[in-house]
Design a protein with these regions (language model features):
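C-terminal ends of transmembrane helices
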Residues: 14-27, 66-79, 122-125, 180-184
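Interfacial helix-loop-helix linkers and transmembrane-helix boundary segments
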Residues: 24-30, 51-57, 75-85
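C-terminal transmembrane helix-loop-helix hairpin of multi-pass membrane proteins
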Residues: 1-21, 125-198
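Aromatic-anchored segments of alpha-helical transmembrane domains
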Residues: 39-47, 91-99, 137-149
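A generic, lipid-embedded transmembrane alpha helix
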Residues: 31-55
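Hydrophobic core of alpha-helical transmembrane segments in multi-pass integral membrane proteins
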Residues: 10-16, 38-44, 65-70, 89-96, ...
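Structural signature of hydrophobic alpha-helical transmembrane segments
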Residues: 1-11, 50-63, 104-115
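Membrane-proximal helix-loop-helix units in multi-pass membrane proteins
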Residues: 60-62, 66-67, 72-140
Length: 198
């Protein structure tokens, strides 16, 4: 069984079980927004803006960096510096795409875009779950074979690989947040019990 076939089967099973919708909702990204982002990214990945000295700017990289933080404006009251969200994200995308020749091509540049976007969210003061869970979803979209599939030009495999990676990333984000919350609760409970004993 080929890798792509395995991804297709697992993705269909996860979608049939409704896992994708639940994990995307929990990670702060709606299904419609996720699908829209992926289609836009797939289209933009075929375009490059060539600058001097062989430097190329990728619209897909800029989109990958900006999109995870756009929905953060819904929660801007919880952010210490909401005015920094989009400028930081755009800067991350431009920087990552300019570094494309040095980070393994488009796949590496998209990977770097989403990673730096999460860091930008943290710098702008977004809460942990808001800044990183949505970005984790996109992080594994690129790591899940999207860049390789784009090079092959097979849209069905692009969408399948991306859907699977998105679901797995959503599960990872949800589990990570749940683990952190549980750890914090346990620590607080233990500390409280110790004080009670004393």
């Amino acid at each position: 069984m080929s890798f792509d076939t395995m991804l297709i089967i697992i993705s269909l099973l996860l979608l049939a079980g409704g896992v994708g919708k639940r994990t995307l909702d929990r990670s702060g990204v709606s299904r419609r927004a996720g699908v829209s982002f992926f289609i836009v990214l797939a289209a933009l990945s075929h375009f490059k803006l060539s600058l001097s000295d062989g430097v190329r700017i990728s619209p897909a990289c800029i989109t990958a960096a900006v999109w995870p933080l756009v929905f953060a404006f819904r929660k801007r009251a919880a952010c210490r510096a909401p005015q920094l969200i989009l400028p930081l994200a755009a800067l991350c995308g431009i920087t990552a795409s300019a570094l494309m020749p040095y980070v393994g091509g488009e796949g590496g540049a998209l990977f770097a875009s989403v990673l730096t976007s999460a860091a930008a969210g943290a710098l702008a003061g977004l809460p942990f779950g808001l800044a990183f869970s949505g970005s984790f979803t996109l992080f594994l979209i690129t790591a899940g074979g999207v860049a390789e599939a784009l090079e092959s030009g097979i849209m069905f495999l692009e969408l399948t690989n991306g859907a699977l990676a998105c679901q797995l990333a959503g599960m990872l984000a949800v589990c990570s947040c749940a683990l952190i919350k549980q750890t914090l609760r346990t620590s607080v409970r233990t500390y409280s019990d110790e004080r009670t004993v004393k």
